Amino acid sequence: MKFKADEISSIIKERIENFDLNLEIEETGKIISVADGVAKVYGLKNIMAGEMVEFENGDKGMALNLEESSVGIVILGKGEGLKEGASVKRLKKLLKVPVGEALIGRVVNALGEPIDAKGVINANEYRFVEEKAKGIMARKSVHEPLHTGIKAIDALVPIGRGQRELIIGDRQTGKTTVAVDTIISQRGQGVICIYVAIGQKQSTVAQVVKRLEEHGAMEYTIVVNAGASDPAALQYLAPYTGVTMGEFFRDNAKHALIVYDDLSKHAVAYREMSLILRRPPGREAYPGDVFYLHSRLLERASKLNDELGAGSLTALPIIETQAGDVSAYIPTNVISITDGQIFLETDLFNSGIRPAINVGLSVSRVGGAAQIKATKQVSGTLRLDLAQYRELQAFAQFASDLDEASRKQLERGQRMVELLKQPPYSPLSVEKQVVLIFAGTKGFLDDIAVSRIEEFEDGIYPFIEAKHPDIFEQIRSKKALDSDLEEKLAKAINEFKANHL
């Protein structure tokens, strides 16, 4: 059998044309040194800042320091079995985490991987952890209320959707309780909540999750946990992972709330990482860009304009102070970034005033525009009344005889302080808050003993629900008090006092 030369050449030509060279070029480097969750790697010449790499043991890493002859890489895992000379592979991509509805009700780590033994998460979308915050034109001013269910906050330091409100105070003053109460209060409000635990004890996080489950709040909540035993790199990443998940809901015309518990530990984790990477330390040994660390995180919370769907992402960062020192580095940084702060005090907490909110130091810079009219009407003078009461209280310790007006003011103040107390994990609806604060500010409680205020509160809600259900209904629908409604409310309160107290 003879072959023609041109046939052979055409077959060879066809083979050459159809030849598929499946070569994947991998860029690898070698570990020079590894210690404390950071690896120094030689040989990754073309690596980008923030790029992901893979180690021999399967752990992922992130390039943070690009130096002349080496790369500083933080290990996003335990780093077990890594030694000098081991190879490191470039992944040529930035860190992405899963986002979407599939995460709701789950507990995940800082990489978005499930840690609640409820099986895999089938996410349809992944997003970059580091995203630029929305610009001015994409935003709208805060104008819708986000009710926390806590009387003292909703009346005096109201929070709006899209706001950043700092919760600040010493350890054991009830900061997490305020945040968890706010999450529980979002039930039925169409708000997706994200709780980010940074550097917390696993037992504490388990307790929070249990509390949320008890109140049915896990149905609309995602928990991101980077515990105290996790590497500093994962503690550093956790808030960014949480906010990326929150942004998904905001960008899809929904409302989300994110709690960072707490950013003091976040800054400590970042300081630890930076010092190991041999970056120059600044004030309190924090690196120079610790302000940017938090500002770029908190700027991602926003209220979007109508063209973009009018979604919102509200942030409640928590900061722990040492002995009430608000002028330390991290507290002042975060105070200047946020739109107000709720200041919790140890002395108030220990004296039984809980939530231990210092009304004088707490402020909401943009929430006033979001407060409903009914709350504004009843709590308009409340802040001033409480401030005058505190002043008089200090004065009354020295003066024995007080005039009638001062005595009345003192007594009204005592009742208002008692009125604003609230047990944990029992958020109140807006209409109930309006009724109670109306009773206090309009003087209906002046003739009730301070010790019986709690009894009054426990009884008035079921009484109105049973005898005057239209009052709550009207406050809900009108969101304001007119003269008829005020009259009805006054009548109902007097009727309750006459029959039940």
Curated annotation (Swiss-Prot):
Q: Where is this site: Required for activity?
A: 362
Q: Where are the transmembrane segments?
A: none
How does this protein sit in the membrane? Peripheral membrane protein
On the tree of life, the source organism's domain of life is: Bacteria
NCBIfam families given in the database record: atpA (TIGR00962), PRK13343.1 (NF009884)
Query: Which EC number(s) are documented for this chain?
Result: 7.1.2.2
What keywords tag this UniProt record? Answer: ATP synthesis, ATP-binding, Cell inner membrane, Cell membrane, CF(1), Hydrogen ion transport, Ion transport, Membrane, Nucleotide-binding, Translocase, Transport
Q: Where does ATP bind?
A: 169-176
Organism whose genome encodes this protein: Campylobacter jejuni subsp. jejuni serotype O:23/36 (strain 81-176)
Cell location:
Cell inner membrane
Q: Which PROSITE patterns match?
A: ATPASE_ALPHA_BETA (PS00152)
- GO MF assignments: ADP binding; ATP binding; proton-transporting ATP synthase activity, rotational mechanism
The record describes the protein's role as: Produces ATP from ADP in the presence of a proton gradient across the membrane. The alpha chain is a regulatory subunit.
Q: Could you tell me which Gene3D superfamilies the record lists for this protein? A: 2.40.30.20, ATP synthase alpha/beta chain, C-terminal domain (1.20.150.20), P-loop containing nucleotide triphosphate hydrolases (3.40.50.300)
In terms of CDD domains, this protein maps to:
ATP-synt_F1_alpha_C, ATP-synt_F1_alpha_N, F1-ATPase_alpha_CD
List, alphabetically, the InterPro entries matched.
ATP_synth_asu-like_sf, ATP_synth_asu_C, ATP_synth_asu_C_sf, ATP_synth_F1_a_nt-bd_dom, ATP_synth_F1_asu, ATPase_a/bsu_AS, ATPase_F1/V1/A1_a/bsu_N, ATPase_F1/V1/A1_a/bsu_N_sf
This protein is called ATP synthase subunit alpha
List the record's Gene Ontology CC terms alphabetically.
plasma membrane; proton-transporting ATP synthase complex
Reaction(s) catalysed by this chain's protein: ATP + H2O + 4 H(+)(in) = ADP + phosphate + 5 H(+)(out)
Assembly and binders: F-type ATPases have 2 components, CF(1) - the catalytic core - and CF(0) - the membrane proton channel. CF(1) has five subunits: alpha(3), beta(3), gamma(1), delta(1), epsilon(1). CF(0) has three main subunits: a(1), b(2) and c(9-12). The alpha and beta chains form an alternating ring which encloses part of the gamma chain. CF(1) is attached to CF(0) by a central stalk formed by the gamma and epsilon chains, while a peripheral stalk is formed by the delta and b chains.
Protein family (similarity comment) = Belongs to the ATPase alpha/beta chains family.
Answer whether the UniProt record assigns the keyword Chaperone to this protein.
Answer: no
> What Pfam families does its record include?
ATP-synt_ab (PF00006), ATP-synt_ab_C (PF00306), ATP-synt_ab_N (PF02874)
